[in-house]
């Protein structure tokens, strides 16, 4: 038979109890690294326009992780910061930030500058232009970038293992550890939990712009 003889939530209940801290670490690291990366991306796009140094942002995606994670690990060891959740967040930012830049650069620079100029003519400063004009108009790509950032962070294994010194457990590190386990039920539960956070992020990225733009017909098309 392809179907199990009986259905039970025992494995789920046990896994949620055993891997609750890993789930919490995964969510904390993903949200923190994504928030930091979003702030960095917005700051970069607001102050730089096709800078020649921008290519350096994407280096972590082009070179093997192990080639520079070892050096980062040595540096943090000397600073006494190895094995902390802050170190893991920093490592994740190195990979989340480039992906968020990829997602945001096109829409951000394609936005008609006349919107900002119109706001400036009404006395709005740079910060008010950003908060009242650009961010609402770019809510859809921002939400998409955040969802991508969360997914990228959740998937990180080597940065978590190296910079966390094996002391910061996430669902990804636990899933890899359980890959050779004989208990497929627990492995299935952990990998399912691993997919929950990215799925929730993408679902919110779809829903939030729809709700925010429900009374703005011109922006509803952009949200779709």
What would you call each of these model-derived segments?
Residues 5-8, 107-117, 126, 139, ...:
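Transmembrane helix boundary and interhelical loop/hinge segments in multi-pass membrane proteins
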Residues 111-114, 206-219:
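Membrane-interface capping segments at transmembrane-helix boundaries
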Residues 1-9, 163-172:
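Peri-membrane helix termini and adjoining interfacial loops of integral membrane proteins
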Residues 1, 13-109, 137, 141, ...:
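Membrane-water interface segments at the C-terminal ends of transmembrane alpha-helices
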Residues 117-119, 184-189:
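Loop-to-transmembrane helix entry/capping segments in MFS-fold secondary transporters
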Residues 122-124, 136:
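Glycine/proline-centered hinge or cleavage motifs at structural transition points of membrane proteins
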Residues 120, 177:
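Alpha-helical residues within the helix-turn-helix
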């Amino acid at each position: 038979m392809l179907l199990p003889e009986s259905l039970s939530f025992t494995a789920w209940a046990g896994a949620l109890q055993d891997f609750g801290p890993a789930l919490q670490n995964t969510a904390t690291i993903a949200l923190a690294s994504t928030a930091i990366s979003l702030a960095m991306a917005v700051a970069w796009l607001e102050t730089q326009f096709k800078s020649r140094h921008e290519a350096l942002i994407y280096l972590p995606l082009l070179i093997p992780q192990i080639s520079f994670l070892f050096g980062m690990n040595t540096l943090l060891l000397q600073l006494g910061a190895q094995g902390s959740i802050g170190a893991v967040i920093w490592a994740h930012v190195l990979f989340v930030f480039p992906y968020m830049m990829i997602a945001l650069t096109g829409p951000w620079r394609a936005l008609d500058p006349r919107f900002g100029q119109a706001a400036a003519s009404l006395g709005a400063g740079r910060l008010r232009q950003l908060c009242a004009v650009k961010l609402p108009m770019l809510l859809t790509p921002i939400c998409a970038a955040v969802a991508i950032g969360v997914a990228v962070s959740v998937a990180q294994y080597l940065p978590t293992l190296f910079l966390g010194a094996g002391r910061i457990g996430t669902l990804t590190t636990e899933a890899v550890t359980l890959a050779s386990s004989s208990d497929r039920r627990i492995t299935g539960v952990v990998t399912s939990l691993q997919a929950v956070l990215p799925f929730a992020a993408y679902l919110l990225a779809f829903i939030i712009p729809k709700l925010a733009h429900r009374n703005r017909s011109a922006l509803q098309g952009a949200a779709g």
